[in-house]
Amino acid sequence: MQNRVAALLLDGHPDLAARAGADGSHLCGIEALGNAIATLKPARIAGCGGLETRHEAMVAAEAGADYVMCGDPDTRGDRPAFEAIAQRVAWWAEVFEIPCVGFAATLDEVEPLDAAGADFIAMGDCVFGAGHGAAAAVADAARRLAIAETVA
């Protein structure tokens, strides 16, 4: 995928990511990251979400995560208030060099996450559950980011 300026990450399954030639895995929590690092590194990306505290994010970074994710839903689909997510992204971007991925639950969250300093924006149901199609939702997000860039 990288020849198309995109990375293909599997949700977990580091062994499958390596066998299938994916670029890496997104792992949920420090334990999953620790279990997967040897399988993925150094050839593949090991990203980490499911981090409930700033401390957990720092531990993930120290353990070798290539990025940390803020705002991803837990197994029940719950996540912190968006304001708390944006604050965590801003704090991370100011203090650390390891990239931060902000999770946008809606297209309206894309611009504020970018403004907060997210290096990347992850989107879930707002793209894949969009009534007007995933391609249109991604194009909408890109337009929002382009607008944010021209205003900044």
Show which residues each predicted segment covers.
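Short beta-strand/loop segments at the ligand-binding rim of alpha/beta enzyme cores
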Residues: 1-9, 38-49, 93-103, 151
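N-terminal active-site wall of soluble small-molecule enzyme domains
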Residues: 1-42, 86
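Glycine- and other small-residue-rich loops at beta-strand/loop junctions that grip anionic moieties
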Residues: 6, 25, 49, 78-81, ...
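Catalytic cores of alpha/beta
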Residues: 8-23, 52-64, 95, 99-123, ...
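Glycine-rich phosphate-binding active-site loops on the catalytic face of alpha/beta enzymes
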Residues: 29-36, 67-79, 114-144
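Histidine/lysine/aspartate-rich catalytic loop segments that bind and position anionic ligands
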Residues: 46-80
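Charged helix-capping and loop-helix junction motifs
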Residues: 81-89, 137
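Extended, intrinsically disordered, low-complexity segments
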Residues: 146-152
